[in-house]
């Protein structure tokens, strides 16, 4: 039977109440992934890396292990585990198996589609991050990969508890371009990014995740300055302008910003490949990589196709589908077709 997860009654209206609610939601795991991982844990020939690779096909499994390893009662170090392999090593296989046995495992068709759609966006973001940045920052590939996969994870329990609210937010903010602050105050009583930041801190997610939310909430002036430079069509002039402000250059070139760039590329692409929001993040990515907009667009399209080959699922939308559409065509939200 499908899992009953939607919370009845009125949605919370304060940050504290939202965090308390989302902390209590149990996110289901696809049964086929669950069975494969449990078999690997019980096979003494499999390494932690083998198990981590199997787990990454189920974002909910990854999140559960990271949360457990980074919980204050379990964390043996002050800093959160930045990768799944480190988290598994902290827990050990026995405790990891006990954790998995507590998780709800369901046939994938019984997992609510709003949750699966947002997890697909996270998987697409992880592919974009790995393809665009991991080869250039090879020693940091695990931080890039896992941080990108988990960046939007605070939205996953929200997709279970109040799917209609999240769906309405996507319709009005992502598709219709309404003012996010007004819509979010009306729907949630708080800003979505502030809620995600609070949940990420409560879960002690990797620092690159919380740093991304801090940038969006507290460092928007610097982001606007960098975007202004990124709009300059002369690449040499771009670099000269950035070099003229060393503090801004250091701020923008932080490796943690790869997580934010990849997730905004993946989220904006849900509408279509020709929209102003996506263009802004493509321009910022081009400046970060010190290459042209055309080169970044080509790379992003290639990574979208690679993600679709690995992650696309029946009845879910993947932006790679839109690569064969007319360039200016955008994906309408289902409620826009009524």
Where are these regions (language model features)?
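Regulatory/sensor and coupling segments of signal-transduction and defense proteins
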Residues: 197-215, 219, 223-338
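Alpha-helical transmembrane segments of multi-pass integral membrane proteins
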Residues: 160-175
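Acidic, His- and aromatic-enriched active-site or binding-groove loops in soluble protein domains
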Residues: 171-178, 230-234
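Conserved alpha-helical "signature site"
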Residues: 1-164, 180, 184, 191, ...
């Amino acid at each position: 039977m499908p899992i009953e997860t939607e919370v009845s009654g009125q949605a919370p209206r304060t940050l504290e109440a939202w965090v308390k609610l989302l902390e209590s939601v149990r996110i289901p795991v696809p049964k086929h992934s669950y069975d494969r991982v449990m078999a690997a844990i019980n096979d003494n020939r499999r390494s932690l890396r083998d198990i981590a690779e199997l787990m990454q096909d189920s974002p909910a499994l990854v999140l559960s292990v990271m949360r457990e390893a980074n919980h204050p009662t379990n964390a043996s170090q002050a800093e959160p585990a930045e990768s799944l392999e480190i988290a598994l090593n902290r827990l050990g296989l026995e405790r990891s198996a006990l954790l998995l046995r507590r998780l709800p495992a369901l046939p994938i068709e019984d997992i609510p589609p709003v949750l699966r759609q947002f997890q697909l966006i996270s998987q697409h973001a992880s592919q974009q991050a790995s393809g665009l940045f991991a080869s250039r920052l090879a020693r940091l590939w695990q931080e890039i990969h896992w941080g990108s996969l988990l960046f939007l994870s605070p939205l996953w329990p929200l997709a279970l508890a109040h799917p209609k609210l999240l769906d309405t937010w996507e319709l009005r903010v992502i598709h219709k371009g309404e003012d996010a602050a007004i819509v979010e105050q009306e729907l949630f009583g708080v800003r979505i990014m502030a809620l995600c930041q609070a949940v990420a801190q409560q879960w002690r997610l990797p620092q690159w995740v919380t740093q991304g939310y801090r940038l969006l909430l507290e460092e928007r002036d610097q982001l606007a300055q960098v975007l202004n430079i990124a709009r300059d069509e002369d690449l040499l002039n771009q670099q000269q302008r950035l070099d003229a402000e060393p503090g801004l250059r250091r701020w923008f070139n932080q490796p943690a910003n790869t997580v934010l760039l990849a997730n905004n590329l993946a989220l904006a692409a849900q509408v279509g490949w020709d929209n102003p929001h996506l263009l802004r993040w493509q321009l910022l990515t081009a400046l970060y990589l010190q290459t042209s907009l055309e080169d970044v667009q080509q790379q992003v399209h290639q990574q979208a196709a690679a993600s679709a080959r690995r992650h696309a699922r029946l009845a879910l939308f993947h932006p790679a589908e839109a690569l064969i559409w007319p360039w200016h065509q955008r994906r309408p939200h289902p409620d826009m077709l009524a």
